[in-house]
Swiss-Prot record:
EC number: 3.5.1.110
Descriptive protein name: Ureidoacrylate amidohydrolase RutB
Gene Ontology molecular function: any one: hydrolase activity, acting on carbon-nitrogen (but not peptide) bonds, in linear amides
Entry keyword Hydrolase: yes
SUPFAM superfamilies named in the record: Isochorismatase-like hydrolases
Pfam families in the record: Isochorismatase (PF00857)
The organism of origin for this protein: Klebsiella variicola (strain At-22)
Length: 236
């Protein structure tokens, strides 16, 4: 068992009965020229997030945690995205961008394309699970719940993009299914202005889960990992 310093309080769990979830670290969300960038969102600050996710993944894997990678998107004909009868058709900024710029049709979030691929710096390894998802929540129309329950996993540590969209949506759905959700705030990034990140983290720590950071996570998994005095005081 480990005790992870977090807000609003520390959380104790067994790493071997927990999962680290990496949400949508695709070129679409983290790279210049990807969907978010083309849709007008700022992705310039994603580099530290990628590095922090790599650090968290390495620590989790060494501790025996299951690593689950999500990729958001659809078939290249966008049948899975839903037609005009689906709210997703009207609210997905990727679909709206392609309607505004027809030359991008078949390129944004299409399975098999560059936009859909995970960024080069993040590579799943043998034993990890990679799951496609067609909507914001990783629980919708995916086997995530079955995968977790069959392994006795109840604690989920979240990283990825976007904090205020797919990360929060998946954590919220997990809360309703009796999962304990923890977000590593410096291993996530928002879609939109900075206040969207802060609002999502406020919602999570106040109503749906817990908020921690990569340094505290790594130190909890391996106490030999140094923890700064500032972090010790932060969660005291």
């Amino acid at each position: 068992m480990i005790t992870l310093p977090a807000r609003p309080e520390s959380l104790t769990f067994a790493p071997q009965q927990s999962a680290l979830i990496v949400v949508d670290m695709q070129n679409a969300y983290a790279s210049q020229g990807g969907y978010l960038d083309l849709a007008g969102f700022d992705v310039s600050a994603t580099r530290p997030v990628i590095d922090n996710i790599n650090t968290a993944v390495a620590a989790a894997r060494a501790a025996g945690m299951l690593i689950i990678w999500f990729q958001n998107g659809w078939d290249d004909q966008y049948v899975e995205a839903g037609g005009p009868g689906s709210p997703n058709y009207h609210k997905s900024n990727a679909l709206k961008t392609m309607r505004q710029r027809p030359e991008l049709q078949g390129k944004l979030l299409a399975k098999g394309g560059w936009d859909y691929q995970l960024v080069d710096e993040l590579t799943p390894q043998e034993g990890d699970i990679v799951l496609p998802k067609p909507r914001y929540s990783g629980f919708f129309n995916t086997p995530l719940d079955s995968i977790l329950r069959s392994r006795g996993i109840r604690h989920l540590v979240f990283t990825g993009i976007a904090t205020n969209v797919c990360v929060e949506s998946t954590l919220r759905d997990g809360f309703f299914l009796e999962y304990f959700g923890i977000v590593l705030e410096d291993a996530t990034h928002q879609a939109g202005p900075a206040f969207a990140q802060q609002a999502a983290l406020f919602n999570i720590e106040t109503f749906f889960g817990w908020v921690s950071d990569v340094e505290s996570f790594c130190h909890a998994l391996s106490p030999a990992t140094p923890l700064s005095l500032a972090k010790e005081k932060r969660y005291a």
